[in-house]
Regions:
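Bacterial Sec-dependent N-terminal signal peptides
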Residues: 1-12
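Low-complexity, Ser/Thr/Pro/Gly-enriched N-terminal "stalk/linker" regions
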Residues: 13-85, 203
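Well-ordered alpha-helical scaffold segments within catalytic/enzyme domains
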Residues: 23-39, 47, 52-53, 96-111, ...
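Aromatic- and histidine-enriched alpha-helix N-cap/loop-to-helix transition segments
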Residues: 39-46, 89-97, 150-161, 184, ...
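Long, well-ordered core segments of solenoidal/helical folds
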Residues: 46-60, 117-134, 187-205
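Short loop/beta submotifs within extracellular cysteine-rich repeat domains
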Residues: 59-61, 107, 133-135, 170-171
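Carbohydrate-binding/catalytic loop surfaces
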Residues: 67-85, 136-154, 206-231
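Short coil/linker segments at helix-helix boundaries
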Residues: 142-146, 172-184
Length: 232
C-alpha cells in the first residue's frame, strides 16, 4: 500500500520539462546512460518505485514495458498481475535492465528495498538455470518454444554477464552479494559457459555456429515462432 501511495503521489504532481525529457526516452537508455547525478533525484526514485511495482512475485519482470512512464490508473491492474508466473523473462532485456537499475539506485541512495528486490531477481535468475547450464526464455511457467535454451536477443548472454559481474564485483553489481553467493554464481557461470560449448553446432566434426534456440534436452537447434526455423 505504501508503494501505491508513493507512486500515485508522484503521478499527481506536475512534471517539469526535464522530467518530460526523461520520460520520453527509452527505458533501457535511461538505465544504461543516465549519469549518477540523476539517480539521487525525485524522478529517479519514482522510476525505482515503478520497478518495484512491476516486479512479479517470481522475482522477474515482464518484457516490453515502459516502466518509467506514470502508472496512473493502471497501477491496480499491474498489482493484480503480481502473481503471474508465465511472463517473467530475460527476453528483450527484461529483468536484466530492472536489476541493473535497482543496483545503480541502491548504490546511489542506499534504500534497502532496492537491494532486496535485486536479490529477489537474482534468485529468480539462478532458479531458472537448467541442469545443463542453459536458461529458457520464460520461467517458472512456460510453454512451446519458451522452454528452449535461448540465445536470441542475447537473453542467456546478458544473464551470464550479470552473474559474472556480481561474482567479480564489477559496478554497478559490486557489494550486493556475500562470498557464499559468489561461489554459487561462479558455479552457475561455468555451467552456462559449458552449455554454450555443448550447444555449438558441429559440421563434419568441426565447431561452427549456434542457433537462436536449442532444445533443452537434446541441445539440438530448435524452432521458435512459425517464421523462426532452426536455421544456422
Amino acid at each position: 500500500m505504501m508503494t501505491c501511495l508513493f507512486v500515485n503521489g508522484y503521478a499527481q504532481r506536475g512534471l517539469n520539462l526535464k522530467d518530460l525529457n526523461y520520460r520520453s526516452r527509452e527505458w533501457k537508455m535511461i538505465v544504461r546512460s543516465s549519469p549518477d547525478s540523476f539517480l539521487t533525484t525525485p524522478l529517479a526514485r519514482q522510476f525505482a518505485e515503478n520497478v518495484l511495482v512491476w516486479q512479479r512475485n517470481t522475482g522477474g519482470w515482464p518484457k516490453n514495458e515502459a516502466i518509467h512512464r506514470p502508472l496512473g490508473g493502471d497501477i491496480e491492474l499491474i498489482l493484480a498481475d503480481k502473481n503471474k508466473r508465465n511472463d517473467s523473462t530475460t527476453d528483450n532485456d527484461a529483468t536484466i535492465i530492472e536489476m541493473t537499475y535497482l543496483a545503480r539506485m541502491w548504490h546511489a541512495v542506499g534504500d534497502p528495498r532496492y537491494k532486496e528486490a535485486f536479490l529477489k531477481g537474482l534468485r529468480f535468475m539462478l532458479d531458472g538455470q537448467y541442469d545443463n547450464g542453459g536458461w529458457p526464455q520464460f520461467w517458472p511457467e512456460n510453454r512451446g518454444y519458451q522452454v528452449h535454451i535461448t540465445y536470441n536477443d542475447d537473453a542467456m548472454v546478458q544473464t551470464l554477464r550479470v552473474i559474472r559481474d556480481l561474482r567479480d564485483g564489477i559496478k554497478p553489481f559490486d557489494g550486493l552479494v556475500d562470498e557464499s553467493t559468489k561461489a554459487l554464481l561462479d558455479k552457475a557461470f561455468h555451467k552456462g559457459i559449458q552449455c554454450i560449448l555443448n550447444t555449438q553446432i558441429k559440421v563434419n566434426g568441426k565447431r561452427t555456429v549456434w542457433c537462436q534456440q536449442h532444445d533443452r534436452e537434446t541441445l539440438a537447434p530448435a524452432a521458435a515462432r512459425s517464421y523462426e526455423l532452426p536455421s544456422y
